[in-house]
């Protein structure tokens, strides 16, 4: 009897997942979107100090205003107006490690090419849903351990040092990059995380009106759902930057987690309506685990539940477009969320 019950439940779940995948599977083969990808890491490294003026001119011509953003804002130097900038960088204590990392980046060339093809396909999907959205120039860089993703109005920059696959090299990374951060530095995440950065800052930025935990969960869930729409063939684990084991924990504990989120405190307030930033962070901030739950809990469980809310909302409202979904307030998602699904 138990065996047949399992099969009975499994089939609808498969059908639901299939329907969701079908909805997001669109034909973008006729799209004219093409990405302009530039390699700042290759243009800069190794630093050649034999002709500084020529190197400065090359970097300015090839990367335009972003060169100034990179050197002055990201690396906190005097920029390319100062002829001592590059020699000073070459003499920094961290420079040998930067070059070791660059060797690791160069060994990932095939994966980088594939990820750029995937990212281009993602922007074709973005253009389908949001024709007015800007398609940025892509700059691939060795960020000297500063930024994994960085955006301006016209540039999406990817710090390849945050996606290196060589675990031996990563063991030597600066101590401010914790183990849980290095665990998620996978080349498989380049396209997805780059698009997440663009969606988060340029397409669906946070408004500042998000006051409760529920607001933040739904906001983040919407962006992850957007990611699924941009990359309909990607696994949920990749979309969330989870291992398969971490994702399995989410599904196994989904109902128990929801009970925690809806638990009422002594002030007669459910956890999802919490407004303290410190408490909200315990559910949605990156970390080794979701600190609001336990050290065994997959991190960012609030965000993952937000994705399930967005999925359920779109599943139950098939006439709603993705842009329209983004405009809905967080409470509307509660009506359709089913943690038992």
Residue ranges and their predicted role:
Residues 268-341:
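C-terminal soluble interaction/assembly domains
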Residues 45, 75, 127-131, 227-235, ...:
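Sec-exported extracytoplasmic/periplasmic mature domains
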Residues 149-151, 249-257, 326-340:
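Short, mixed-charge aromatic SLiMs
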Residues 87-247, 322-326, 330:
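Acidic/His-rich structured neighborhood in mature extracellular/periplasmic domains
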Residues 222-290:
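Acidic/His/Gly-enriched intrinsically disordered linker/tail segments
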Residues 4-13:
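Sec-dependent N-terminal signal peptides
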